[in-house]
Regions:
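Gram-negative bacterial Sec-dependent N-terminal signal peptides
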Residues: 11-13
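Mid-length scaffold segments of soluble, non-membrane domains
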Residues: 80-117
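Metalloprotease/metallohydrolase-associated module, dominated by Zn2+-dependent proteases
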Residues: 24-81, 124-187
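Sec/Tat signal peptide C-region and signal peptidase I cleavage site
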Residues: 17-21
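Structured catalytic/translocation cores of nucleotide/phosphate-coupled proteins
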Residues: 22, 98-100, 104-107, 123, ...
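Bacterial N-terminal signal peptides that target proteins for export
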Residues: 1-9
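Substrate-binding clefts and substrate-entry loops adjacent to catalytic sites
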Residues: 89-91, 122, 127
Length: 187
């Protein structure tokens, strides 16, 4: 269902070299997106919000990081899932369809993390010329991601429109394949 939009731009200007930008330090307990590790019902550990009538909520994020070494900029992004903020109203009655809907929220976050990695890889700039470019590119990615998540819930009626849900699944999986060159090596 809806995504919790907690955003943490983790600026890791540590001077540790471009390789350090390949791994972003995630918040404690966060689950890093991985094609080999789909979400399971037990991952949804948060308490349901009584004010929301949704059956479940996925709290995903795109964490960003940057390094400078020898005045050379390198940046990356990583999709993550926050179990403590994600919930399912009645875990015993979570259907496979609902779990697929929630997984696709996480998959959409990964699509936008890959798009951001693609943009960051194309930024051939020095750190002293970086200015607010990293912030602007990251914020634009977050905005586009949020819009896609909202469109997904609206178009599928939170997964209740099965035909539209199937179409979104096909589209998102195709986008993941198209952006495979920007997947993390062990994701």
């Amino acid at each position: 269902m809806p995504i919790s939009w907690w955003k943490a731009l983790a600026f890791l200007l540590l001077g540790a070299g471009p390789a350090a930008a390949q791994q972003v330090k995630l918040p404690p307990g966060a689950i890093r997106w991985s094609a080999s590790r789909p979400l399971v019902v037990a991952d949804f550990k948060g308490r349901p919000k009584t004010s929301q009538g949704h059956a479940a909520l996925t709290s995903a994020n795109i964490n960003t990081g940057a390094t400078c070494r020898g005045n050379v900029f390198a940046g990356t992004a990583q999709a993550s899932f926050d179990p403590a903020s994600s919930w399912v109203r009645e875990p015993g009655s979570m259907t496979p369809a609902l779990l697929r809907h929630e997984q696709l929220h996480f998959d959409i976050a990964e699509v936008y993390a890959r798009r951001l990695r693609q943009q960051l890889a194309a930024m051939h700039t020095t750190c002293d010329r970086l200015g607010g470019t990293f912030d602007r590119i990251s914020q634009a990615a977050y905005t586009a991601w949020q819009q896609a998540e909202d469109d997904y819930d609206r178009d599928t009626n939170h997964g209740l429109q099965h035909e539209r849900q199937a179409r979104w699944e096909t589209q998102v999986h195709q986008q993941l394949r198209e952006l495979a060159a920007f997947a993390e090596k062990d994701a």
